[in-house]
UniProtKB/Swiss-Prot annotation:
It comes from the Viruses. The record marks Y22 as: Binding to TAP1 subunit. It holds the Pfam family Herpes_US12. Interacts with host TAP1 and TAP2; these interactions inhibit the loading of peptides onto MHC class I molecules. Residues 76-86 have a biased composition (Basic and acidic residues). The gene is US12. The lineage of its organism: Viruses, Duplodnaviria, Heunggongvirae, Peploviricota, Herviviricetes. Residues 2-35 are annotated as: Active domain. One of its GO terms (cellular component) is host cell cytoplasm. This is ICP47 protein. It is found in: Host cytoplasm; Host nucleus. The N-terminal active domain blocks peptide binding to and peptide transport by TAP.
Length: 86
């Protein structure tokens, strides 16, 4: 649904219950979109979220294939270097 239709739908729904203006509804939509973008940005850069790492990062490094390419976590590369070191 386009932004204009979504805004119009929200305005019509909210105007039945409250005395909000079209500008109030637009401001609310923009606020929610900013919050969603910030939450997505935080989720990508938050080091406390281990689920964003590939599953092999949480496994035993000795049991992994040392030639396997891993992406996404610096820790996995460090572990891989330790496994490959002579």
């Amino acid at each position: 649904m386009s932004w204009a239709l979504k805004t119009t739908d929200m305005f019509l729904d909210s105007s039945r219950c409250t005395h909000r203006t079209y500008g109030d509804v637009c401001a609310e939509i923009h606020k929610r979109e900013r919050e969603d973008r910030e939450a997505a940005r935080t989720a990508v850069t938050d080091p406390e979220l281990p689920l964003l790492c590939p599953p092999d990062v949480r496994s035993d490094p000795a049991s992994r294939n040392p030639t396997q390419q891993t992406r996404g976590c610096a820790r996995s590369n460090e572990r891989q270097d330790r496994v490959l070191a002579p």
